Amino acid sequence: DITSKFLIPEESKSSAYIICKEQNGAVLSGIDIARYIIEELGGSIEFNKIKNDSEDLNYFDKICTMSGSTQILLIMERIYLNFLQHMSGIATYTKKFSSIASEYNVKIADTRKTKPGLRKIEKYAVLCGGGFNHRFGLFDGILIKDNHIFAAGGIKEAIDKIRNRVPHQLKIEVEVKDWKELGEAIKSNADIIMLDNMELSMIKESVKVIRESLGSRCKIEVSGGISLASLEEICKTGIDIISVGAITHSAPAVDFSLEFE
């Protein structure tokens, strides 16, 4: 930070705080990462946390205070604010979905549509917003998608092959997009059926058919094109899970500001 080095003496000390500048409020995520950046990477900065991750924030709420080298506070400013803005943005956007879905006992889950290198913190931010984590990668859950179905020769063939090899504790989820695939998934006793990019009317009928055939043993997930506007009507259909890629890849950043005192 050549600007700070030219303007501010090395021995200068200051006190500062970070405030939320979202007029409609936000959900905090990333405060401990900010503390790590400041304390571990920034040298002898004293950091005091005021708010915790997952807490609701109001406009102008202070989330922490800091004191120490003026140069270090300014050099590190954009780094820790970027993490706070991004992670709190995900938590805040997730909360908008989860607060509606929870009224119907429906879980909002994330996807693998995350920024390269940031999946762990983005999925943590989803938890801060009341959401749930879907698979972290391709190693911790079985999800048979359209290309798997094509490669295996059909849903029944795919499920049979996996069932013969899968550890007993792993559930088998299959993605379906039409009536034919839904029928195959039901006949194959899939543990979880994902209804992919279906119209509301088809979701309703699909839920009815699944419940009549498999009862509540089979979990029903909906995915594809879910928005806040369509969310409540989808929740009313009796599904269990809605996976929303937008909560990680399209969440608006939350505005935070560093202020000196």
Where are these regions (language model features)?
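Active-site core of metal-dependent hydrolases
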Residues: L195
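A short helix->loop->beta-strand "cap" motif at the edges of active sites that frequently abuts
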Residues: L214-C218
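Glycine/alanine-rich phosphate-binding loops at beta-alpha junctions
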Residues: M198
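Active-site loop ensemble at the mouth of alpha/beta enzyme cores that anchors a bound cofactor
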Residues: S257-E261
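Periplasmic-binding protein-like
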Residues: G224
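Cys/His-rich Zn2+-binding cysteine-cluster or related metal-binding knuckle/ribbon modules and their
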Residues: L228
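Acidic/glycine-rich phosphate/pyrophosphate-binding loops and surrounding catalytic core
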Residues: D1-S188, I192, S201-V209, E221, ...
